Amino acid sequence: MTAAAVLAGHEGPAAAVSVPLLVKRLGRVDYAPAWEAMQHFTASRGEDTADEIWLLEHPPVYTLGQAGRPEHLLRNDAGIPLVKIDRGGQITYHGPGQLVAYLLLDLRRRHLKVRELVALMEQAVIDCLAEYGLHAERKDGAPGVYIDGAKIAALGLRVRNGCSYHGLALNVDADLAPFGWINPCGYEGLQTIRLKDFGVGDDVAAVGERLLQHLLRLLPPGVVPSR
């Protein structure tokens, strides 16, 4: 799928907020065109461009954020691609069975600071997992969502001209072996887990719809600047 195809996507209905928000359910998309599409969307948006949330999966890929160090890739027996990208954070893995939600938002219109958006994304995941009877929590100084100290969701953002892109990744039924070949998010020995480990049978699409409702509930409304 090309970057242009990602941008076309499948648009859902606008959310019931003052600032228009479109939801795109993209299925499985290669990382590079998705990243290119996020950059293009953010660079070309205007004051009245609708915000968007993209729900998708990626084929196996490691991404290395701006704070990442190549030595955190310990081994790569499977030949998984490594892509150096512009989000915050360090190294992580994306692959089938992992829900990815990209939040392309004008933070100024929604009166959101970056740290507030991070906390909002974490809370949306925590509330989503609570629907499955799971108690998840934050960890000071280590963005993401954890259950008993093991990481189930990773976060990373880039903000350009007051607008965010990238977002979060939640392990649903992903193969966790590739996490064992890195120091996830730069932390040696950090355990990663998935919803499947707790008997959750929902697939990525079903979990995505639950998470989406919590994101929409928590996002503050905003106003498109009048002309």
From Swiss-Prot:
Cite the GO molecular-function annotations of the record.
lipoyl(octanoyl) transferase activity
| CC terms in the record's Gene Ontology section | cytoplasm
Q: Which UniProt keywords apply?
A: Acyltransferase, Cytoplasm, Transferase
- Judging by the UniProt lineage, the source's domain of life is Bacteria
The residues listed in the UniProt record as binding substrate, with positions renumbered to this chain, are: R87, G88, G89, Q90, I91, T92, Y93, H94, A154, L155, G156, G167, L168, A169
Q: Name one GO biological process term.
A: protein modification process
Coiled-coil ranges (or none): none
Listed pathway(s):
Protein modification; protein lipoylation via endogenous pathway; protein N(6)-(lipoyl)lysine from octanoyl-[acyl-carrier-protein]: step 1/2
Q: Which Gene3D superfamilies match?
A: Bira Bifunctional Protein, Domain 2 (3.30.930.10)
Chain ranges of the BPL/LPL catalytic domain: 47-223
Which EC number(s) are documented for this chain? 2.3.1.181
CDD domains linked:
LipB
Enzyme category, top tier: transferase
A Pfam family the protein falls into: LplA-B_cat
Compartments in which it is found: Cytoplasm
- Active site positions: C185 (acyl-thioester intermediate)
Q: Which HAMAP family match?
A: LipB (MF_00013)
Q: What does this protein do?
A: Catalyzes the transfer of endogenously produced octanoic acid from octanoyl-acyl-carrier-protein onto the lipoyl domains of lipoate-dependent enzymes. Lipoyl-ACP can also act as a substrate although octanoyl-ACP is likely to be the physiological substrate.
Q: Which family does it belong to?
A: Belongs to the LipB family.
Q: What's the miscellaneous note?
A: In the reaction, the free carboxyl group of octanoic acid is attached via an amide linkage to the epsilon-amino group of a specific lysine residue of lipoyl domains of lipoate-dependent enzymes.
Q: What is this protein called?
A: Octanoyltransferase
Which gene underlies this protein? lipB
